[in-house]
Structure formats: C-alpha cells, structure tokens
C-alpha cells in the first residue's frame, strides 16, 4: 500500500493507462479488459487490473492537473514498480487542422507550471515522451486507419486562465492544451520509466466546438484502443 493507493503488491500491472477521470478508468476496464479486479478506490480514484488480448494491464484515474497526477505517478513507480505509464485524456485543440475527436500523441509537453523550474533550479527542462511507446502507438493508430497528429502539447497549470496567450502557442506549433503530460513525462524520465500521453481533442479553443461531458467519460474509443495496443506490443 501507499498513501493514496490501497493495492497489494502484485495487483498492479507493469503497464498502466492513466485517464484523469476515474469514471473513464471504470469505463475502460468494463469495456476493454477481461478478468477485471478493482485494486483502488481511495478518495474515489478507481483503479482496475485486467487483461487485454491475454496481457496484464491496469487502468487508474489520476485526477486533474499536475499536482494530482504527480502524486499517483510517484506512488505507482516508487511503491508498485510500474514500468510503462500511458495517459489517456482530453485536450483542447488550438491548430486549424486539429479537429474535435482527433487523436493526438504528445511528443513533448511544454508547461507554465513552476514545478520543473523549482526542481531544476530555474532550468527549463524539456519533458518528452518515450520514443518506443510513441512509435508503437503511432503504428497501431496507422494500422487502424486513424489520422493521428503527433507533436508538442501544452500542460496548463490552470484550467481557467485568461492571461495565457493561446495564439502564441499555436503560432509556435503547439497542437493543444491539457493539464498533465509535462508532469508525467518529467517523473518518468526521473525514474527511468517509459511514458506517453495519447489525447482526444474534446473541444477546440478557437472555434468553440466541443463534446459533451458524457461523451468525454464514455467514448473516445480510438484513443483507448491505440493506448492498449501500444501497451501490449
């Protein structure tokens, strides 16, 4: 057990999918996994382990934002020796060719959070995805005929932030805005683990097009399948 996860040793797989929403974790477990076992419900952060195509895979919510995902990733790695961590979440698109419901693979994650500057004494550390996981996910998506976008995303420290210059981010090629990937990548690099963020565009920040809360919780299956295929290859 750890402070925020009640699983026993051996109950969490070496590879875990990490949606922000614990109800999406439940949906993934019930829809895609077999022989599912609940391993965590501390603070309502549901975690499950099952099998996908015969391979052991876990899925667990992380909550929203860098502080929350940092807690769970630290504990999953330090207390349960998880090797591969794949975020499956949503983002707001900011490029004209990034459409609502598109699947984006985050090659790198910029951020306005001070967490890395505090860690690295003012140095701008560049958090990046694990290339082997990225390639597996990309290949899986192409095999399924998906039009994937791969590139830089922005991990925002605040959801509501009128001062963030989103147009400047778009001008520099950032594909969209989410809230967790930079922390996930930084911690994976710190501990020598593999991490990837696969994201579905839930809304477009400039056009105003958006999906419903229910759709965000219970659909976006393309992203989930790409993540699971990357997890077992």
From Swiss-Prot:
Keywords: Glycosyltransferase, Transferase. InterPro entries: DeoD-type, Nucleoside_phosphorylase_CS, Nucleoside_phosphorylase_d, Nucleoside_phosphorylase_sf. A purine D-ribonucleoside binds at residues 4, 178-180, 202-203. One of its GO terms (molecular function) is purine-nucleoside phosphorylase activity. The record marks 216 as: Important for catalytic activity. It catalyses: a purine D-ribonucleoside + phosphate = a purine nucleobase + alpha-D-ribose 1-phosphate; a purine 2'-deoxy-D-ribonucleoside + phosphate = a purine nucleobase + 2-deoxy-alpha-D-ribose 1-phosphate. It is an enzyme of class 2 (transferase). Transmembrane segments: none annotated. The keyword Cytoplasm does not apply. Coiled coil: none annotated. The active site is at residue 203. Catalyzes the reversible phosphorolytic breakdown of the N-glycosidic bond in the beta-(deoxy)ribonucleoside molecules, with the formation of the corresponding free purine bases and pentose-1-phosphate. Belongs to the PNP/UDP phosphorylase family. Homohexamer; trimer of homodimers. HAMAP family: Pur_nucleosid_phosp. This is Purine nucleoside phosphorylase DeoD-type.
């Amino acid at each position: 057990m750890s402070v925020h996860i009640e699983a026993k040793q051996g109950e969490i797989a070496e590879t875990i999918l990490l949606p922000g929403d614990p109800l999406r974790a439940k949906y993934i477990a019930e829809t895609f996994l077999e022989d599912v076992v609940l391993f965590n419900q501390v603070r309502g952060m549901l975690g499950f382990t099952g099998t996908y195509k015969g391979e052991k895979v876990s899925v667990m919510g992380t909550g929203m934002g860098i502080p929350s995902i940092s807690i769970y990733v630290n504990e999953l790695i330090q207390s349960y020796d998880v090797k591969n961590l794949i975020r499956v979440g949503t983002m707001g698109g900011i490029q004209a060719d990034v459409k609502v419901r598109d699947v984006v693979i985050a090659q790198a994650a910029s951020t306005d959070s001070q967490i890395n500057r505090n860690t690295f004494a003012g140095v701008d550390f560049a958090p990046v995805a694990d290339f082997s996981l990225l390639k597996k996910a990309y290949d899986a998506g192409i095999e399924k005929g998906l039009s994937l976008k791969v590139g830089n995303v922005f991990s925002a420290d605040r959801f509501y932030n009128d001062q963030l210059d989103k147009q400047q981010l778009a001008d520099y090629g950032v594909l969209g805005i989410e809230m967790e990937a930079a922390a996930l990548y930084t911690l994976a690099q710190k501990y020598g683990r593999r991490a990837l963020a696969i994201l579905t565009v839930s809304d477009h920040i400039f056009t105003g097009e958006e999906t419903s809360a229910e759709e965000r919780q219970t659909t976006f299956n393309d992203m989930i399948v790409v993540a699971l295929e990357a997890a077992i290859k």
